[in-house]
């Protein structure tokens, strides 16, 4: 089940509680054993020297732990939805030029260049810190392409980065997953990391992504769970519109 709150959901769980007790009771009665919640890692763990972008992270971590423990009482695990390492506003890169990836001017931000050392080191550190602070977490669910600016090839635009343009897109995905896996399992060896193949393609125009998916899978850590999208290659029809 997806707990539908999105954004900065852990800052005030009294005003906006994503999993109230009555909802958890209903979930448990229906046999639901897990919920996933949107999380933004820099709001839970700061980048050293740029703590101003993470104000309130201590409160968020405490609240996350409270929610995870509450869900656990009902036999339900919280899985954090991670789309990381999340791109940051331009001001962040003025202080951290060694993080800077491709420009995303429509969002007034950049992606993080994971061909550089620091973004992946921080991703591992942040995952370890979050799962240490909230030990009742069941795991995480990762989308590594599309969605939000993350690494330089998140939207198939690695050619705009001099460090990433000649690298295999499969390696860029696998390195992000590996960093998160190391961090999560350093603090919580029993946690599950589920990795979705959403938008996995060599190029954005590709219609057959099977070979590329195989390349990524072959590079993933052996102790993650792979999730495929059920509608790949399926004909669809909604409101008279076929797809």
Feature map (PLM): residue ranges:
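Aromatic-lined carbohydrate-binding surfaces of glycoside hydrolases
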Residues: 1-243
């Amino acid at each position: 089940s997806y707990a539908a709150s999105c954004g900065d959901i852990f800052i005030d769980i009294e005003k906006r509680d994503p999993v109230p007790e009555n909802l958890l009771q209903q979930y448990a009665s229906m046999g639901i054993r897990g919920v996933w919640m949107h999380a933004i890692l820099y709001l839970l763990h700061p980048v050293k020297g740029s703590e101003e972008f993470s104000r309130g992270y201590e409160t968020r971590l405490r609240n996350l732990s409270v929610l995870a423990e509450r869900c656990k009482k009902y036999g339900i695990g919280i899985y954090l939805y991670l789309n990381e390492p999340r791109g940051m506003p331009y001001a962040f890169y003025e202080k951290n030029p060694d993080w800077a990836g491709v420009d995303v001017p429509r969002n007034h931000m950049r992606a993080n260049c994971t061909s550089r050392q620091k973004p992946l080191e921080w991703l591992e550190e942040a995952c370890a810190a979050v799962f240490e602070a909230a030990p009742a977490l069941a795991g995480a669910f990762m989308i590594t392409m599309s969605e939000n600016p993350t690494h330089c090839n998140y939207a198939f635009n690695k050619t705009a980065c001099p460090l990433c343009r000649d690298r295999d897109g499969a390696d860029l995905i696998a390195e992000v997953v590996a960093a998160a896996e190391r961090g999560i399992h350093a603090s919580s060896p029993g946690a599950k990391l589920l990795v979705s193949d959403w938008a996995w393609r060599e190029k954005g125009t590709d219609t057959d992504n099977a070979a590329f998916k195989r390349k990524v899978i072959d590079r993933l850590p052996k102790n993650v769970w792979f999730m495929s999208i059920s509608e790949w290659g399926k004909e669809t029809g909604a409101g008279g519109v076929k797809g």
